[in-house]
Amino acid sequence: MVRTRPVPCVPSPDVNTATRRNPGRPKKQSIGADLSTTISKPGRPKKLSIGADLTTIRKPGRPKKLGADLTTIIRKPGRPTKLSNKQSLTALNEPECRIRKCVVKIRRIKVKNGVVSEISRNDAPDVDASTFEPARNSTMYIPSKVQKSTQPQNIKENVAGPETSPCQQRIRSKSPSGPAAEISPKKPPRFFHRDQPLTRTRSSVTRNVFDFLSQSQIEDDSDREDPAADIIQRLVKDGKACVMVRSRKIGKPRAKRTAKKVRPVGNRRKVSTKDNEPEPVKVVPKSIEPRLQKPSRSLSTIFEPEEDYSNDSEHGYVQPIEVPVQVHVEPSTSKQAHEGAYSNLARSVMLNQTQAQNPLPSTDRRRELINMARQLVSTPLNRRAPPVTDVSATTTALSPIAHQSPNAVRTAGGKSPWRVSDDSPLPNTFMFGFNNSQMPSYSSDHVQRRHVYVPDSPVEHAENIPHEESICPPLHEQNHDSNANDSNEENRPPPTISKSMSINDQESEENAENFVHLPNPRRTLQKRTPFKDINILEVVTLPSWKKNVTATVSKEITPTRVAPRPMATSSPAQRSQTRSNLFGFDDDFACEDIPRKSTTPSKGIAPTSMSLNREVTPALANRNQTEVNTFGCNEILPCENIPKEKETNTEERTSSSQNLFGFDEFITESQDSPANFTGLSQNVNLHDKLHRLAELRPRDGELPQVSYTSIRSDCLGESHSKQTDIRYMLCSTMIAPPRPAKRKPAAPTARESMGLFRVDQDEPEQSFADKQPRRTYVKERPQRKRKKRVQILYIESESEDEDEQDSHDKSLDSPEKKRHHVKRPRRDIEHEAKLEQFVTSFNKQCEEVEKFPVIIE
């Protein structure tokens, strides 16, 4: 605040006895004349002058313009001229002007740190020494935006002074100028720089708002430091970055040319160490010291913030741009700590808040919470293998790589053959599943799962589990099986309940890594692992994708090893599904599947297949006779009476063919299908069963001989090349090469005449094959030939047409000739259309003839 000299020519007692003026617009009085101002009744406040002092006191009421600065008063051009001292005195002493009894004496005093100097305190009571604060509605009031963000609210103390008049009161406010000066100590005080040229704008009033904001948001601060300037300079110096400059000629940015400093080789080392010196001084000693005090512990992949990291979750803490502020360390007074976004005052306030709310033992509390979380969810780096018991160690491991000892340190991906550590003992040979590429499938590349918690004591849990298999798998399997890259997922039947569970099976469930071969193929809870062949539980032959193949045969191929309890394994839904897919062939299955005690095999049946009858799936074996009769097969003999001769075979065939829902006409065509699917199984015993099924069908001599050559090439032959089986889709499944059908080589000599007819039949197809390119989108090559054909239709003169051919390219300019060429081929198109119509009708007739089987008697 500026101390001003009181004007000696004004006697103070005269002012107090001033008369009250009538309400109205008062005359303007000069400020230099007297420091005492009259406050009239409320009216429209005048605009504040530019040099006005903002920290002046006022009495309650709406003031007239109090120009605080005595040196510079800038007036608008329309205002009246300044009154002299005499004029102002006469104006005051005139009897017309009634002055209110409220008199304000303004005295400017420098206040240091909010303490009024001794001189001002000892002054006469009528002289008020408090700082001036304008009212909210006055023109001298600073806008509310600025008031909120920069200055804390002024705390007013109403001190009752000596009552000179009933309305006189002194308002002493605790000035905020002391702490406000501390916010930016570098800059000169903003409000009272009288010696500088007065260019005062609205933005300069609100400028200290930005002390709390980051440096990047200060727009009008020219000398602020770029936080990343040193990094950019170092990058440019190292040659990793280049400064872009806008070129004067073109205006496009170009790289600024920097002169390369050629240093001698000896000095090069010294310069690099100088550049790197300031870095360790900043960061290293502070970060290392708290870590040295802690006991060393095993690392885990859970990220635990150390003490020297800033805790982002703490209340009111925001991480600065450049230097991470260490919350629990006392803030250093050096300049390095304050290079971030916050001013000194803001940083100290926030650090005091966080330290009050988070005392030092909060780190121990955080460590406790982290340990509690680690017990619940853990992702250990070195996953400990559960101890391998002797029983499971003897069983064959599925992976060809030998398991390491449980105490050995294992890498994250040690199980896969493609991620083998150098120390792990490898076998001499790798057994890969034979798919077509002779490479291991994706399921063999077993990636070890992260985020799986292995309990510390798996043996204790295993003792408590009763010897009973639950329907749902254990928790850790249930959660993560869907994520595993495991090809056995689609082959799983519905879960089974079987109480015959060995101790070995339970251990293999408890220990996630001890995978063993299990004798039961229908076991649901086993995991899919590399190099394991898939047990195909059920293969459904899909109906043919061709329209003319009407009869679809669907058979169930069963595994050899049968579950110990047959009824439990096959659910009723499965049985009904396989039952409905069997159309008319279920009687064969019913007769063949029921085990016979004393029957001698017929000629066609192999003796080995008879012994295997007991192993057939219970889904078919448990069918009773009433279930068979639902399909209308009442005439079928009981299954013990299976004939030993061919004649009764034919009788049974005819009786079953009556129940084929009208498909019995095509039974000769679909007879071949079971022989086609025999070669697709992995199991030797299944082959024998299917061969035995084929032998139950009638022989070639018993049926009228049908020529299969033409039909097979068109209708049925493509089913050999097409892979219509779901087993071709599965990975790591061994696919046997398809066997040739039996009936191809045994063709009778009577079919030679058919072959002759077929040669004759192929001729028209070959003769008209030249027309095929016309149907494509390719431009036709023989254009000249078409012109020759046109010449025959339009005979004018041969010489003209020959000239036309030669000059066709030259005469394209004339539009008349163009039109002529376009019109000419129309008759030729009609001719071709008739030809094509004849060809298609002839081909249709040939196809219809082919459909009828030629029976040679």
From Swiss-Prot:
UniProt keyword list: Cell cycle, Cell division, Chromosome, Mitosis, Nucleus, Phosphoprotein
Species for this entry: Drosophila melanogaster (Fruit fly)
Biased composition (Polar residues): 146-156, 165-176
Major location (coarse): nucleus
Name assigned to this protein: Protein dalmatian
Pfam families: Sororin_middle (PF09666)
Compositional bias ranges of the Acidic residues kind: 797-806
Biological process, per Gene Ontology: cell division; cellular response to radiation; mitotic sister chromatid cohesion; negative regulation of apoptotic process; peripheral nervous system development; primary branching, open tracheal system; salivary gland development; trachea development
Keyword Cell inner membrane recorded: no
